[in-house]
Amino acid sequence: GSIIKPLTVAAGLDADAITPQSTYYDAGSIELDTFTIHNFDRRGRGTVSMQEVLNQSLNTGVAHIVDQMGKGTFRQYFLDLKLGSEAGIDLPNEVHGLIGNLDSPRDVEYATASFGQGIALTPIGAVRALATLGNGGHLITPHLVRAIQHEDGSTQPVLYPDGNQVFTAETSEAISRMLVNTVDDALRQGEVALPNYTVAAKTGTAQIADEVQGGYYEDRFLHSFCGYFPVYDAQFLIFLYTVEPQGARYASETLTDPFMELLTFLINYYDLPPDR
């Protein structure tokens, strides 16, 4: 779903294919390989910036970014983010993500992958990739153990190797600013923004694949929400998802409140200092 869009925007920024101020003309849909790709509401917005691509979650916008950077470059970023691999967490029976569509020469496969359709990720695989946006661009292998405390009271830190640099620190800072703007201005029209803390977040509303008939159900969705904070010294990343929620079409309706409740609890519990 659309939580992938920040990764596409970050790749475009990192490849110097776009800037946050870059614009494109949004007609509401594009034609690729005899397929039509629409925005979620099938409306065009005219000339819009990359910031508005995130604010309004425009499918045509991230497809435009792929076109600007080229399919090969886009594919390489997704490979560097290990989206088709296991995340490597120290738990049994982990499975890998599915991005085999990017082996296709068809433009439409890359366009749909840019907004999270036609690919599949595990929650921990998604978290691993999305964490690069807020940690300076490093792809870190997730682990459960930070230290071992012995019976004599001594503590032995468990050290892990640094992750690979996928995005530059400048790209990480730029996409984080954009996602803060999305929360401040667009997420529920800015009503959940916190006055003293920066929060970077993106929602996702993905159609569920119809494994019998092919294609996607029109009325069955997977909602997701990912955010990290405080952005300029990020301490926490929260990833939520729910399968086939009832009574709401979009993830902003179902998962914003749980996210903000968890965020508020963590700020209070760890007494995090304000960052704005």
Where are these regions (language model features)?
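Beta-lactam-recognizing serine transpeptidase/beta-lactamase-like catalytic domain environment
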Residues: 1-2, 7-242, 251, 272
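Short, gly/Ser/Thr-rich active-site loops of penicillin-recognizing serine hydrolases
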Residues: 154-157, 256-276
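C-terminal soluble interaction/assembly domains
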Residues: 244-246
